[in-house]
């Protein structure tokens, strides 16, 4: 009991010795080498508990996007690694030590390389800002308080009430990471991510467009991507700030298209839904006069709905379709698929190589539109 109370005292003495600015801005007790070690342990846990999707071409494609973003705008010295988590839930997250993750479900919902670059830039920014390490430090503070409560309870005969408070381990650390960041951290990651996209040659409007579409989807389904909840009053302001900064960046340089065809082509064969569903993504090239409903009847499994096709492609069920459009569709394993008439090039329409940076690459951006 004495050692636990001493630990609490030492911890809070350390907190009180920190400058006010460090406490206000968020601080971390984790060194960079500690982040790398912890990131490796968390990566093992994620792989063991959730599993990774390792199709070589898709993995190489996603890794190339992350490398391009890191070269353009990340100030950290980590070796960044990106992995595809083999689950249907729509999410992307970063841990510590340069580990970035995107789920199968998120890849399904994105519509272009530029949107994926925006999501990855946002997560890389959380690593650059050490947001996860700060979360871990806060969690440790709560854990130390919990240990103090155990010791105090023991002196009062109530120790059994605290038996569930285990020391902060890897599982607890992962739970902390998967929880939402505070609004300030999300705004800063948006800001840095948008600038990183522009520096890498990606149109920053892609991230703003995705955030807006995701908010609409959350209203319909109740499913959310961390830090973006449609019921929060700050969400609309956050999206508006992202759109304003994206337009400001676009006014300073030109960008190529979003890379929709190249992105969708890389998704062909990606499992859809839960692993046991035995469904996968395919592409369908629209012919003159076709509707979403007629395409569903023509090529999709009976259990798939018109709404599902529309949602995958961010359309409404009665939207008119242009001949030649490429739609993402869901088919059963082994089901023959009508292939697009033209040969698709997985590099066609990819954004151009990055232009010269807009500013010093190691500067953490802060502007009038996306500041705290």
Where do the PLM segments sit?
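An N-terminal domain-start capping segment
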Residues: 1-2, 238
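Surface-exposed, polar/charged interaction patches used for macromolecular assembly or partner binding
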Residues: 71, 367-371
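Arg/Lys-rich low-complexity patches in intrinsically disordered regions that function as generic
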Residues: 363
